[in-house]
Amino acid sequence: MDNTIPGGINITILIPNLMIIIFGLVGLTGNGIVFWLLGFCLHRNAFSVYILNLALADFFFLLGHIIDSILLLLNVFYPITFLLCFYTIMMVLYIAGLSMLSAISTERCLSVLCPIWYHCHRPEHTSTVMCAVIWVLSLLICILNSYFCGFLNTQYKNENGCLALNFFTAAYLMFLFVVLCLSSLALVARLFCGTGQIKLTRLYVTIILSILVFLLCGLPFGIHWFLLFKIKDDFHVFDLGFYLASVVLTAINSCANPIIYFFVGSFRHRLKHQTLKMVLQNALQDTPETAKIMVEMSRSKSEP
């Protein structure tokens, strides 16, 4: 059976790439709005700094995949060097996004398990410093990997260095996955099974939903890229169907976070009285709903 359409494009390639473009455009809009609001319109706190950087990583990650899908559908051919540089940039953004999500989960877990230490001894600019370290480390890992594996300089390839860096990159990703899963489980266990009662806030829901979506949609891309793709000796030999499916899922993951913020922030609120700024502020709210209602009632009573 012929799976091509007029123009010579295989339908098994056309449909996933169209989905990547559609989800990518939705994600670009959502992450762009989140970045604008957190960067220029809202007061930033410890967690909003991470979310701002996560939105930035997702924005450029989606932009790269949209460009790649458009070039593929238009049958634009480009040098292998361009392709390898593109995948290096995508690697930086993927590692940075995963690191941001792991940092968010870990910080939230520490704030719940060690509240006194967290509120009294945590340095003021920890989030900003951590985000800077994450970006630098992600960039350094990927540049070194590309250099020693001959991506940036095809005339130079160090087999031992390439193998060592591939192993380190895979180990670092596994470490991030483990930290993300353990901190999330500890957070959920403390919320629902702990001795002291901790009331659920919108920030908890936002973080838990973002992590759940990543584990379902973002994880397959990392597994394919760093466990299957790196094992193969030939760059061109890999399962195209699984690769495209993992890219579609990771596009869904990158565009899901703004939707989660909108859903959590607007839940039980009348949308006609809510601006996007207020919705995002509600999604990052770290006070129980009952406490917020009491504060609003006290304010309304004090007004003449």
Swiss-Prot record:
Subcellular compartments: Cell membrane
Positions on the Cytoplasmic side per record topology: 39-53, 97-131, 188-206, 265-304
Extracellular topological segments: 1-17, 75, 153-166, 228-243
Keywords attached to this entry: Cell membrane, G-protein coupled receptor, Glycoprotein, Membrane, Receptor, Transducer, Transmembrane, Transmembrane helix
Glycosylated sites: N10
A Gene Ontology molecular function term of the record: pigment binding
SUPFAM superfamilies from the UniProt entry: Family A G protein-coupled receptor-like (SSF81321)
Record-annotated disulphide pairs: none
Family: Belongs to the G-protein coupled receptor 1 family. Mas subfamily.
Function: Orphan receptor activated by a subset of RFamide-family neuropeptides such as FLRF-amide and FMRF-amide. Mediates its action by association with G proteins that activate a phosphatidylinositol-calcium second messenger system. Its effect is mediated by G(q) and G(11) proteins. May regulate the function of nociceptive neurons by modulation of pain perception.
Protein name (record): Mas-related G-protein coupled receptor member A1
Lineage: Eukaryota, Metazoa, Chordata, Craniata, Vertebrata
